[in-house]
Amino acid sequence: MNTPGLWAGLGESIFLANIGERERSPTRLVGVLIGGLAVGIVAATCITCLTMIPLTLALGHGSEGIAGLGAAASALADPNRNDLTIQIGRLVVTTFVDDGLLLVFAAFAAAAMHRQLRIYATAAPRIRWRLVLVGLALATLALTPLVTAQRVLDGAPPLPILSVAPDLGGRVLYVAAALLLIPAAAVEELVFRGWLLRQIAAFNQRPLILIGLSAIIFAAAHFDFSPDAFLTRALMGAGLAYMTLRLGGIEFAVGAHAANNLLIVLFLQPLSVQSQSEPVSMFELITDAALLGGYFIATEAVVRWPWLRRLGDVRPAEISPPDNLTTEFG
């Protein structure tokens, strides 16, 4: 029996197994999109109110009631406010709200399809937590040269981790808040790689459609349509989709996604309420290509090096074909 090539093998990923008639029902899909987004928005609204209360108190507006909440929201949205309290507030509010919306959506989708939520995370018998750490470590190694090059190109501006506060205590608080980006990456992967890849596969399992469509939807969902940001997110989404299909779960992609976000807010720029629209430069194209290449190399390192597979708790049966170095790419 002929073994499919690397690209074709992605369509046979174990992560796409057991897709049934419920996933193939257009009516049920529309119901999931409408119902899941509705309950997700309700959850996000409630979480916004809850997370804004401590921020309002921290900014000294606690005695002003509803007006105080409005003042805190205005401070959070002010692009000229970048002090420690605001930066931590942006990280906390953004991650909690996004996590709430996406997690509720994924849970609604799983319930509508009569599935356990875990099916959107992994095809392995259990969540491979060590694979998350392997993804975090390898992606950090792959992305560090790109971050360094970006800093050199920008004229080596002050590191956010140092400039956000003058003292060690403030910097530690900032790092602690930035760590919320790890569960945030996990929830994003649960929806945009877990649920979305399986849902697309219910109608078409061709790798180009699976990876291309999920990458475009992932980029569009950030509502930042400036050419440079959209292209970067789309290529990042393609790389994360490749990881998920190749390794049979989102765990490695969670680590890679989290590493990307952490490196940005700690060493490039803090979380911002505004993004400047810029044309796609040659440097941007090179770094985007390097990002995608780094994701591919890191994934194949796990596939092809037995010690990395053992470290990440990856079994050969969970890898899409071809699953060994002697199989010719095709």
Which functions belong to the PLM regions below?
Residues A111-R130, I200-L213, P322-T326:
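Cytoplasmic juxtamembrane regions at transmembrane-helix boundaries
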Residues L55-G60, M113-H114, Q150, D154-P158, ...:
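Short helix-capping/hinge motifs at transmembrane helix termini and TM-loop junctions
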Residues V104-I119, A149, V187-V191:
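Juxtamembrane interface elements at the cytosolic ends of transmembrane helices
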Residues V92-F96, R118-V187, L197-R198, A202:
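Juxtamembrane helix-loop-helix connectors linking adjacent transmembrane helices
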Residues M1-H114, Q276-G330:
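N-terminal, membrane-interfacial amphipathic/helix-forming hydrophobic leader that caps
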